[in-house]
């Protein structure tokens, strides 16, 4: 088997024109099938009918994709990496002599190519959605017209490198091809600049589908015209392809319920469905169901905003039942109910601010979070309930401040029963002990001493204080870590005139605490008195 490449095919002007026609047919297989069926049936069919794709997404194309211009400034470079030419095994085993078969791996490089396409898209997506929705859930709109946008896309400076696998059997009259390791780069320009970035991202993701399905199909269809010799085989191949297209065509969406099925449905379910449909077709502020906050779970309707706010935890809401019951028994209207704001007032407040829910919530938190006077007078309040309500209001306000100002408020927390870690253990044991009052009495023989005072510079006030202290000294109460004296004048006298005091004064001064007695005995010179040793931290 031999083959050759004719470079003149790529250099001729007809190559770009034929490639443009093939790409246009490959990009619009659905419209081509519609036109063929319309010609066969004898009636014209709208080729721009909107249908859903097999993936479930809406088809926004209102017209065919027309390839306006294709230009290969440079001839594509084709490099054969592997080639296997032989006879088919199935044909040899059947005794038919075999058919020519070729398998090869090639590297394709394209540089400097340009492609320009144009189409018309539908921008009213609501019209496309309602075209496929059942009638019993489709609302009635005042206007739902089409809004078409023509768009032109230009791909310039296309650079592509890919590894392709080619499979050819002469008897099958076609070439099978697949692409692997595709590297593609291009410059994109769109007539609608606001959509250019979005379309470019989606096109780059759609290139995988282009090289896996669209381009191999176009090359296969093109190869059929090259290797088909008889009209019979061409018509049979065309018939097989049309049959395959009809089987692969996505079926139109079907209505779930028919007239016979509606009779078997529950009347209660149909009533709920009709109520749901009617609620979606009205702009009234009055709810269709007064006992519920919202017909749709997780959503809050505007007309039910007041009932939602009235159920928020607050002191007035919690004790309103108590006050209302008391007013009903007394035969007078409730003052608390008269103080509640109207719905119009809440709507005016919500329209003046950006967040209607937070604005109305702030009103109830600040204006209506009041404890009724009747509850205070009759002591009908509960401190635990009031604390719980105030905590919820505080946490709600702090959450709102944290979302708006991005600052977390500080809150003082007191923990009971927590020991201090930095305090020594032996000090805690000492503080738990009760202070002990002790008295030491020393008996010594009394002798009248001779006191000689050479000079006296003391004032009269000091003399009177000294005489009163010496005549009736007081016992000193002390603990293990602190020592108190009853007079600074006594300490001054003992330090300055300790050697000049008589024996009676010495005996009276000895009736003090054990810790103070150690210091006082040292000052008075009573070293023979046995005293306990001082504590380690004294």
Swiss-Prot record:
InterPro entries xref list: Mdm34, SMP_LBD
Region (Disordered): 26-55, 231-251
Superkingdom as given in the UniProt entry: Eukaryota
Protein keywords: Lipid transport, Lipid-binding, Membrane, Mitochondrion, Mitochondrion outer membrane, Transmembrane, Transmembrane beta strand, Transport
Membrane topology: Multi-pass membrane protein
Subcellular location: Mitochondrion outer membrane
The protein's assembly and partners: Component of the ER-mitochondria encounter structure (ERMES) or MDM complex, composed of MMM1, MDM10, MDM12 and MDM34.
Gene name for this UniProt entry: MDM34
Function summary: Component of the ERMES/MDM complex, which serves as a molecular tether to connect the endoplasmic reticulum (ER) and mitochondria. Components of this complex are involved in the control of mitochondrial shape and protein biogenesis, and function in nonvesicular lipid trafficking between the ER and mitochondria. MDM34 is required for the interaction of the ER-resident membrane protein MMM1 and the outer mitochondrial membrane-resident beta-barrel protein MDM10.
Originating species: Candida glabrata (strain ATCC 2001 / BCRC 20586 / JCM 3761 / NBRC 0622 / NRRL Y-65 / CBS 138)
Record remark: domains: Lacks alpha-helical transmembrane segments, suggesting that it resides in the membrane via beta-sheet conformations similar to those predicted for other outer membrane proteins and porin. The SMP-LTD domain is a barrel-like domain that can bind various types of glycerophospholipids in its interior and mediate their transfer between two adjacent bilayers.
Record-level Gene Ontology MF annotations: lipid binding
Name recorded for this polypeptide: Mitochondrial distribution and morphology protein 34
Domain SMP-LTD: 1-224
Phylogenetic classification of the source organism: Eukaryota, Fungi, Dikarya, Ascomycota, Saccharomycotina
UniProt record, GO biological process: mitochondrial genome maintenance; mitochondrion organization; mitochondrion-endoplasmic reticulum membrane tethering; phospholipid transport
Family that this chain belongs to: Belongs to the MDM34 family.
GO cellular component: ERMES complex; mitochondrial outer membrane
């Amino acid at each position: 088997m031999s083959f050759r490449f004719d470079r003149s095919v790529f250099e001729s002007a007809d190559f770009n024109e034929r490639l443009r026609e093939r790409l246009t047919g490959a990009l619009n297989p659905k419209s081509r099938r519609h036109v063929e069926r319309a010609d066969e049936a004898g009636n014209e069919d709208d080729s721009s009918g909107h249908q859903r794709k097999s993936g479930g997404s809406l088809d926004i194309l209102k017209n065919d994709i027309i390839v306006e211009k294709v230009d290969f400034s440079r001839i594509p470079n084709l490099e054969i990496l592997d080639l296997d030419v032989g006879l088919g095994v199935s044909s040899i085993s059947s005794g038919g002599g075999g058919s020519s078969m070729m398998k090869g791996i090639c590297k394709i490089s394209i540089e400097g190519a340009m492609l320009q396409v144009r189409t018309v898209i539908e921008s009213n997506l609501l019209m496309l959605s309602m075209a496929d929705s059942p009638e019993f859930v489709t609302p009635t709109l005042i206007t739902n017209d089409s809004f078409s946008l023509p768009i032109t896309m230009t791909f310039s400076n296309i650079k592509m490198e890919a590894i392709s696998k080619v499979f050819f059997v002469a008897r099958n009259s076609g070439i099978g091809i697949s692409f692997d390791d595709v590297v593609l780069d291009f410059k994109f320009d769109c007539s609608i600049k606001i959509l250019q970035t979005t379309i470019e991202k989606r096109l780059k993701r759609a290139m995988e589908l282009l090289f896996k399905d669209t381009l191999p199909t176009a090359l296969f269809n093109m190869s059929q015209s090259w290797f088909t010799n008889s009209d019979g085989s061409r018509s049979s191949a065309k018939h097989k392809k049309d049959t395959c297209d009809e089987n692969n065509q996505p079926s139109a969406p079907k209505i779930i319920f028919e007239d016979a099925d509606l009779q078997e449905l529950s009347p209660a379910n149909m009533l709920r469905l009709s109520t749901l449909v009617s609620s979606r077709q009205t702009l009234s502020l009055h709810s269709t169901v007064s006992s519920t906050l919202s017909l749709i779970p997780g959503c809050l309707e505007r007309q039910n905003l007041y009932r939602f706010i009235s159920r928020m935890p607050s002191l007035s809401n919690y004790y309103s039942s108590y006050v209302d019951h008391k007013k009903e028994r007394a035969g007078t209207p409730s003052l608390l109910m008269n103080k509640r704001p109207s719905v119009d007032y809440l709507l005016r407040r919500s329209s003046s601010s950006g967040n209607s829910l937070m604005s109305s919530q702030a009103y109830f938190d600040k204006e209506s979070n009041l404890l009724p006077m009747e509850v205070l007078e009759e002591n009908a309040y509960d401190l635990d309930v009031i604390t719980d309500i105030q905590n919820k209001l505080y946490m709600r306000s702090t959450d709102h401040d944290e979302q708006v100002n991005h600052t977390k408020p500080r809150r003082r927390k007191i923990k009971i029963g927590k020991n201090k870690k930095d305090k020594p253990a032996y000090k805690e044991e000492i503080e738990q002990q009760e202070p002990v009052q002790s008295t030491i009495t020393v008996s010594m023989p009394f002798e009248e001493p001779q006191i000689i005072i050479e000079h006296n510079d003391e004032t009269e006030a000091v003399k009177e204080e000294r005489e009163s202290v010496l005549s009736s000294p007081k016992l000193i109460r002390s603990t293990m870590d602190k020592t108190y004296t009853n007079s600074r004048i006594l300490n001054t006298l003992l330090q300055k005139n300790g050697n000049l005091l008589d024996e009676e004064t010495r005996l009276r001064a000895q009736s003090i605490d054990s810790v103070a007695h150690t210091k006082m005995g040292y000052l008075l010179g009573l070293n023979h008195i046995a005293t306990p040793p001082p504590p380690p931290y004294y």
